[in-house]
Amino acid sequence: MKEFSQEAEQVMIERFGKDTIISLETTENTTPYVRYVNAYYENGAFYVITHALSNKMKHIKNNPVVAIAGEWFTAHGNGVSLGYFGKKRELCDCREAKKVFAEWIDNGHTDFNDENTIILQVELSDGLLLSHGTRYEF
């Protein structure tokens, strides 16, 4: 991925460096599937807590190229399962995800004892960000 300028990265952090809703598009057999997901942005990627057996993850296993859209932002990226949410990892700090998603994370919807509760990373490859009349492409 081409790096964001420092200004664009700051806009990304302000808009998406917290619990936010984005649309995530996957494809199966040339048919697009779009859904809203809770995500947060950090260092060129979005992170989503999801279930390994969900349709989105089945689609991503067969075709990791995804599209996302948020507030004045569209992009493509590669979806990768980082594995079980409770596993220690270097790429993503689960404590940060728990903090970011604190408003809803313990509402019973997510079972952290289930090893199919995973972190989906969408590493951005290209996109367009608009902010106050400025167009940032990467």
Give the residues covered by each predicted segment.
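Short beta-strand segments
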Residues: 19-52, 58-60, 66-70, 80
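Charged, gly/pro-rich active-site loop segments
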Residues: 2-3, 74-138
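Generic preference for well-ordered secondary structure
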Residues: 8, 23, 32, 44, ...
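A generic secondary-structure signal marking the coil-to-beta-strand transition
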Residues: 12, 20, 116-118
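Short secondary-structure boundary/capping segments
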Residues: 13-14, 38, 109-112
